[in-house]
Amino acid sequence: MADAAVIEKLEAGFKKLEAATDCKSLLKKYLTKEVFDKLKDKRTSLGATLLDVIQSGVENLDSGVGIYAPDAEAYTLFAPLFDPIIEDYHVGFKQTDKHPNKDFGDVNSFVNVDPEGKFVISTRVRCGRSLQGYPFNPCLTESQYKEMEAKVSSTLSSLEGELKGTYYPLTGMSKEVQQKLIDDHFLFKEGDRFLQAANACRYWPAGRGIYHNDNKTFLVWVNEEDHLRIISMQMGGDLGQVFRRLTSAVNEIEKRIPFSHHDRLGFLTFCPTNLGTTVRASVHIKLPKLAANREKLEEVAGKYNLQVRGTRGEHTEAEGGIYDISNKRRMGLTEFQAVKEMQDGILELIKIEKEM
């Protein structure tokens, strides 16, 4: 049972949402009085309540989604709120659907999407993972953060070959190392207001860190938004090489660290937008002719379920006609299918750009 003080805060938060007529978040759309009354006094075995789930969206009425999962159990206990939001965000993934098992497929079927090097500046594939047996950010204690960091850093330090590298803890990091990581665009900052309000940044920077290999093509963020963000990237358009590196890293790490997985939802993450495959495959790409015809660009992107963003990510402009283009779908399809869809879409965009 949630305690009286929590329920009081929840009631106030619900009133605030109800009164916010211009709020367009999925939280507002799906947290009906009926759902609210059903969930307000529930509590996970780790002590998380509905307040942990919705507080970021109550605080930030301009949220797109507005909810986070404080622990793995929250996805089941608070399913009457999570399920419709997941179905709405991950278009086509119905509440009766089951996410397929992990399948990287034939990684050799991925290619260099731009062998001439005229369009694609860089290619990146990332996935998120949570460690089994640990809650997500809002419920973690400082000692759990440190315990997880110790487990992860020792696992990463044992990687060999191309993945061999160095772990840099944020705690006690020297100014020189910090600057070097900023220059390489590797350093993550303390969370934005959405993550702050979700209590995702407690005990900062305890347990947080960055690992990268010697040639800076493989990167792991430890305890940023998710327990692990595993990233493979390089200049140019060789998606095959980037994806192969990612899959071999994930498979190596998984041998030593069990990940949080849900029968219906796939791999679990702090934010419900990343569930399922958790995979985001993206390129920074110059498409000057299509950039002048944004409608055509969006039309092709829509056909292949691609998301088009500005160069610096969400809500930014395309600097010098350079776009960040990635797969949109994360749920209800395999890792292989998600990356294949992105590859097909990018090849099509390049073909159209050449013909214009």
Curated annotation (Swiss-Prot):
It catalyses: L-arginine + ATP = N(omega)-phospho-L-arginine + ADP + H(+); dTDP + ATP = dTTP + ADP. Muscle (at protein level). It is an enzyme of class 2 (transferase). The keyword Transferase applies. GO terms for cellular component: extracellular space. CDD domains: arginine_kinase_like (cd07932). Its EC number is 2.7.3.3. Signal peptide: none annotated. The keyword Cell inner membrane does not apply. One of its GO terms (molecular function) is arginine binding. Transmembrane segments: none annotated. Keywords: Allergen, ATP-binding, Kinase, Nucleotide-binding, Transferase. It holds the Pfam family ATP-gua_Ptrans. GO terms for biological process: dTDP metabolic process; phosphocreatine biosynthetic process. L-arginine binds at G64, V65, G66, I67, Y68, E225, C271, E314. Residues 9-91 form the Phosphagen kinase N-terminal domain. Residues 119-356 form the Phosphagen kinase C-terminal domain. Belongs to the ATP:guanido phosphotransferase family. Catalyzes the reversible transfer of high energy ATP gamma-phosphate group to L-arginine. Has nucleoside diphosphate kinase-like activity toward dTDP. Binds and phosphorylates dTDP using ATP as a phosphate donor. Does not phosphorylate dADP, dCDP, dGDP, dTMP or thymidine. Monomer. PANTHER family: ARGININE KINASE 1-RELATED (PTHR11547:SF38), ARGININE OR CREATINE KINASE (PTHR11547). This is Arginine kinase Lit v 2.0101. It comes from Penaeus vannamei (Whiteleg shrimp).
